[in-house]
Regions:
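Generic anion/oxyanion-binding catalytic loop in active/binding sites
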Residues: 1, 17, 46
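Basic/polar N-terminal segments that are highly enriched at the extreme N-terminus
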Residues: 1-10
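A solvent-exposed, acidic/Ser-Thr-rich amphipathic alpha-helical stretch
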Residues: 5, 25, 30-82
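Amphipathic alpha-helical segments that line or abut small-molecule/effector binding pockets
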Residues: 9-13, 29
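Alpha-helical assembly-interface signal, strongest on the long, hydrophobic N-terminal helix that forms
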Residues: 16, 20-23
Length: 135
C-alpha cells in the first residue's frame, strides 16, 4: 500500500475516533479542507438527503452532540486507492433525548458505507450511505 493511502486510512480512523469522542469546532474541522462537502444520501433520518459545506458539517456535529449520549464506529472493512478511501462500518448511537418513537437512552443502529476523497491529506468530499435498522 502506498504511503499516501496508508496515511489517508490513519486519518479516517482518527476522524471516526474524534466523532466518537464528540469532537466539534476546530477539533473536527482539522480533518477537512476548507471547501469540504458531505453528501448524505436519503435515509430514515433524512428522507431527502443533504449536501453540507464545512460550516454545516460542524454545526451538525454540535447538534449530534446534543442528540446522542454516545456513538461508536466499528469498521468492518476499509480500502484505499490513491486519494480515495471507502469504509463499511456498524454504528450504534445512544440517544440523550427522545427522537420520534425512541425514548432517551434508546440505541439506534445503522450500517454505513462512507466514501472519502482527499486533498493534501484532508477530507475534501464525504459521501454517506446510511442504512438504519428499524425501530
Amino acid at each position: 500500500m502506498a504511503s499516501v493511502e496508508a496515511s489517508n486510512l490513519v486519518t479516517i480512523r482518527a476522524y471516526l475516533a474524534a466523532l466518537e469522542a464528540g469532537a466539534v469546532g476546530q477539533a473536527l474541522a482539522k480533518f477537512f479542507t476548507p471547501d469540504a462537502q458531505q453528501v448524505e444520501l436519503p435515509n430514515r433520518l433524512n428522507s431527502n438527503g443533504r449536501l453540507s459545506d464545512l460550516p454545516t458539517i460542524l454545526q451538525r456535529a454540535e447538534q449530534g452532540q446534543r442528540l446522542l449520549r454516545s456513538q461508536s464506529y466499528e469498521i468492518k472493512s476499509e480500502v484505499a486507492h490513491g486519494q480515495c478511501v471507502a469504509i463499511e462500518a456498524t454504528w450504534p448511537g445512544t440517544l440523550a433525548v427522545p427522537l420520534g418513537s425512541l425514548a432517551t437512552e434508546a440505541t439506534m443502529k445503522a450500517h454505513f458505507a462512507i466514501f472519502f476523497e482527499f486533498t493534501d491529506g484532508r477530507i475534501r468530499l464525504q459521501r454517506n450511505y446510511d442504512c438504519f435498522e428499524p425501530w
